[in-house]
Amino acid sequence: MNKKIVLLLIGIAVFIGCGKKVKVPPKEDINKTVEQNITIMEEPIVEPELDIFDWQQNDEVFSEGIANKIVVVKSKRVAVLFDEDGNMLSRHRISLGEHPVGAKREAGDKKTPEGVYHIVDIRRDPKYYKEILISYPNREDIEASKALGVNPGGGITFHSQVPWNWDGHGDDYTLSHDWTIGCMAMTNKGMDNVWDSVNTDTIVEIRE
């Protein structure tokens, strides 16, 4: 056969072969391949960091020492005692006045004060076991109440539980709501610890 004819036939065969359609895999197979190649990155769940005033169930802290300051955070229902170096001595869950939001301004408003005070008296009480009287009203409280034309009241204390709960069996119930006339109530066990830690030099700071 003529050499030119042979080369022509080979070229035609190659051309026809290259012109064949490429077989496309089904859409389902493509999706499966893509899904297999995707790596899903899951973000770790970050728990909020608790600070010293965050209360968790049954984490009341007791220790011995002289308290330089008691800090009450009303919104967290907690009282924390600190020594003169700022170290935590103890932490206690508390109940507030029946109307806990806002600072006390008037006698009978059943609000717990907000401000800086000091301890005036430490005494036993037939109704509340033991109590610690603070220096409410201070100068700012008196001026604020005077501007409103009202009596600021007084007699605000830290106190413990009523007689039926002196053994502590009802602590979970009493501490689950605010029930005082403006005072700060804690467990009898907590009061025993605070009682041994404070004196009339102890500062009381009550925050919102």
Segments the model singles out, each with a brief description of its role:
Residues 16-17:
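C-terminal motif of bacterial Sec signal peptides marking the signal peptidase cleavage site
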Residues 65-67, 74-77, 89-91, 112-114, ...:
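Extracytoplasmic
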Residues 25-50:
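Post-signal peptide N-terminal segment of mature Sec-exported envelope proteins
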Residues 85-98:
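Short Gly/aromatic-enriched secondary-structure transition segments
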Residues 1-5, 20:
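Positively charged n-region of N-terminal signal peptides that target proteins for export
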Residues 51-69, 74-75, 96-120, 139-144, ...:
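N-terminal post-signal-peptidase region of extra-cytosolic proteins
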Residues 121-208:
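Exported/periplasmic cell-wall-interacting domains
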Residues 5-13:
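Sec-dependent N-terminal signal peptides
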